Amino acid sequence: MKAKGNQKTKVNIVTLGCSKNLVDSENLLTQLRGNGIEAEHESKNDNSNVVVINTCGFIDNAKQESIDTILRYIDAKENGLIDKIYVSGCLSQRYKDDMEREMPQVDAFFGSNELPAILKKFRADYKHELVGERLLTTPSHYAYVKIAEGCDRPCSFCAIPVMRGKHVSTPMEDLVKQAKGMAAKGTKELILIAQDLTYYGLDIYKKRNLSDLLKNLSDVEGIDWIRLQYAYPSGFPLDVLDVMAERSNICKYIDMPLQHGSSDMLKLMRRGIDRPKTEDLIKTIRDKVPGIAFRTTMIIGHPGETEKDFDELCSFVEEQRFDRLGAFTYSHEEHTHSYSMEDTIPQEEKEERQATIMSIQEGISAELNEKKIGNTYKVLFDRKEGGYFIGRTEHDSPEVDNEVMVSAKDQYVRIGDFANVKINDAAEFDLFGEIVK
């Protein structure tokens, strides 16, 4: 990157954090190019002279990664390699005043929902007509669709409402327009994301309207899979399950972070649901949508978690046998309700408990995968790597779930295509198979 005072603006967008941040960066990329500005995402070239860093501020590790990235580009600026640095996203939303004071080399800081303000720095205007033209940074056959911004939930451990604000649903017509635009470019899978999918519509339609959104997206020609991520258990709209069972292009998959298996801990976490009601909901979901893959996450070591609470979490995971599960150690975050509670559990103990949960899940996953041997699944192939074509079934999200491996030695499939794969071997988190007609 070589800075020249009168050089034409060339922008590199750097994204940290979750898929919701990725969508924000894709929207910025689309708007910049739509205004005639040269822009790339995660550019490996050295010809950009302006960098926009879209930060994450969710937990300590994410905050540190964001800070390290900003400092790296500040060093580049001080060495004359770039002209301007703009910082956006959750970290600058949360700590804008502190960052302006500590990082004067950054030209401007923006919060999580300030796309028009960022564009003004480039003398560009927000063009609503580009809503259906979003440029993707993922492989073109799948795309994340953010159906809402912000969150109204009061979870004790989470600072998202501080960083992202109140829940705001995206109008259904805009989401359908996005889906049609993506389908026209060859996108086959839509992954619906939000801080809380199940709240969709309450603000603009005065009712939970996820089921109607699913129907409308399901009708878009060319979309083979629609996947739900980040559903909230309390107040889950059961009519979503009816649509999922009826529509063949809605994946039999749900990502529902449950966070714990102890009623006492769920109360401390302010989740609005206890263990018995959670168990009833899981049973209802599995009864209404046979064969559904249930993904969840758990938080380990929240203030107040006793050994008894942790034992209850272990028994909960063992009894429910989730198809996919992630476990994360509690991070003591400012601007959260639980920050006022003493973080008494040592990090080492949190990590030991986390390892115990993941060991339990590893055994469950191995048993569930073993039962898939001999079955044939429709697989969407994402990439070729290390002598294998690697794809996913409808029961798996990109990057976080199981993968299906097919040897590239004597078989071929085009990336982004579907193929039927017969499973002939299984590991804890991977399946191995061969393409069949």
Curated annotation (Swiss-Prot):
GO molecular function terms noted in the UniProt entry: 4 iron, 4 sulfur cluster binding; aspartic acid methylthiotransferase activity; metal ion binding; protein methylthiotransferase activity
Subcellular location, record wording: Cytoplasm
Cellular component, GO annotation: cytosol
GO BP term, pick one: tRNA modification
Alphabetical list of InterPro entries matching this protein: Elp3/MiaA/NifB-like_rSAM (IPR006638), Methylthiotransferase (IPR005839), Methylthiotransferase_CS (IPR020612), Methylthiotransferase_N (IPR013848), Methylthiotransferase_N_sf (IPR038135), NA-bd_OB-fold (IPR012340), Ribosomal_uS12_MeSTrfase_RimO (IPR005840), rSAM (IPR007197)
SUPFAM superfamilies (UniProt xref): Radical SAM enzymes
Residue ranges occupied by any Radical SAM core domain in the UniProt entry: 137-367
Binding site for [4Fe-4S] cluster 2: 151, 155, 158
Entry keywords, A to Z: 4Fe-4S, Cytoplasm, Iron, Iron-sulfur, Metal-binding, S-adenosyl-L-methionine, Transferase
Gene3D superfamilies: Methylthiotransferase, N-terminal domain, Nucleic acid-binding proteins, tm_1862 like domain
Domain TRAM: 370-437
NCBIfam families in UniProt: 30S ribosomal protein S12 methylthiotransferase RimO, MiaB/RimO family radical SAM methylthiotransferase
Protein name: Ribosomal protein uS12 methylthiotransferase RimO
Natural source organism: Cytophaga hutchinsonii (strain ATCC 33406 / DSM 1761 / CIP 103989 / NBRC 15051 / NCIMB 9469 / D465)
